[in-house]
Amino acid sequence: MGGGVSVELPKRDPPPGVPTDEMLLNVDKMHDVIAPAKLLEYVHIGPLTKDKEDKVKKRYPEFRLVNTGPGGLSALLRQSYNGTAPNCCRTFNRTHYWKKDGKISDKYEEGAVLESCWPDVHDTGKCDVDLFDWCQGDTFDMNICHQWIGSAFNRSDRTVEGRQSLINLYNKMQRLCSKDASVPICELFLHHLRAHNTEDSKEMIDYILRQQSADFKQKYMRCSYPTRDKLEESLKYAEPRECWDPECSNANVNFLLTRNYNNLGLCNIVRCNTSVNNLQMDKTSSLRLSCGLSNSDRFSTVPVNRAKVVQHNIKHSFDLKLHLISLLSLLVIWILIVAI
């Protein structure tokens, strides 16, 4: 019997491991990647050592640290948004910020802590309490308040909390503005109520304006509350008083009652200049100004030159390709014959 043959193979060290993409991640270079993460979204941050874990937890308190694999592979899971109303609501461009020693910055710096703003924070009514107070102060931004009040009429939040916040805002605005509608935030509110253009918004406008003081009405609402003489004068004209009364044409439209605002929109205003050097009139005199727009001037009675009109239309029409049209006609006839 023959014996077996053994062969000794040369020994080799196994090839070095190739790191995966996750292993190459560096959490210290991922500030702008982690911050925008949505609620319950995972962000893989690569391997972490034990001492590094504590720093990451402190830097990102809105996230929970999760182990994803061997070698300390980890991920962050967003659980909350810790941004405050003053830091998130008084701008429409901020999604998050970094806080250190009581100061905030849009850029990360060593030792700073992330605080994120709730998505669509203005659309959910989470800013109503803060902005209602801030927009009455001395440091408010008119553009921010303008956009906030305008967006309140078009919110997509249909939750019970969102609806209640909107009702509370309307009630507070109504109480505030009924006392003095000249407050900037109230004038903005009236403007957006007018733009909303519903029966409810019109009723709220009139309710607020009718609650104003006598001094306010005398100063801002002389169109809506005219004198007896002005009312008697208006009986002489067929057109609405709002069309010729300077108190209406020069009024702040935010302080017009709905009926006056609507009448003002019906006016056809024609402006003309009249120069009079010397005019003497008595009780029997009569003066009428037409600005050169008599009935005979409005429509021309001169016959239209029809031949010239036809020539103009032919000249400016597209060039007819008669030979091309003939060829296309023959082609269509041939196709119809073949098809039959």
Curated annotation (Swiss-Prot):
Q: Which GO terms describe its biological process?
A: fusion of virus membrane with host plasma membrane; symbiont entry into host cell
Pfam families assigned to the protein according to its UniProt record, in alphabetical order: Pox_G9-A16 (PF03003)
**Subcellular compartments:** Virion membrane
Q: Which residues lie on this side of the membrane: Virion surface?
A: 2-319
What post-translational modification does the entry describe? Unglycosylated because produced in viral factories instead of the classic ER -Golgi route.
Q: Where is it predominantly found?
A: virion
Q: Name one GO cellular component term.
A: viral envelope
Sorted alphabetically, which InterPro entries does this protein's record hold? Pox_virus_G9/A16
Name the membrane topology term: Single-pass type II membrane protein
Keyword ATP-binding found:
no
Any keyword Transmembrane? yes
Q: Where is this region: Disordered?
A: 1-20
Query: Where does the record place the N-myristoyl glycine lipid attachment?
Result: G2
Q: Spell out where the chain crosses the membrane.
A: 320-340
State what induces this protein.
Expressed in the late phase of the viral replicative cycle.
Assigned keywords, A-Z:
Fusion of virus membrane with host cell membrane, Fusion of virus membrane with host membrane, Late protein, Lipoprotein, Membrane, Myristate, Signal-anchor, Transmembrane, Transmembrane helix, Viral envelope protein, Viral penetration into host cytoplasm, Virion, Virus entry into host cell
Give the family, as the similarity comment puts it. Belongs to the orthopoxvirus OPG086 family.
Q: How does it assemble?
A: Interacts with OPG143. Component of the entry fusion complex (EFC) composed of OPG053, OPG076, OPG086, OPG094, OPG095, OPG099, OPG107, OPG143, OPG104, OPG147 and OPG155. Except for OPG095 and OPG053, each of the EFC proteins is required for assembly or stability of the complex.
Role this protein plays? Component of the entry fusion complex (EFC), which consists of 11 proteins. During cell infection, this complex mediates entry of the virion core into the host cytoplasm by a two-step mechanism consisting of lipid mixing of the viral and cellular membranes and subsequent pore formation.
Q: Any idea what this protein is called?
A: Entry-fusion complex protein OPG094
Question: What is the source species?
Answer: Monkeypox virus
Phylogenetic placement of the source organism = Viruses, Varidnaviria, Bamfordvirae, Nucleocytoviricota, Pokkesviricetes
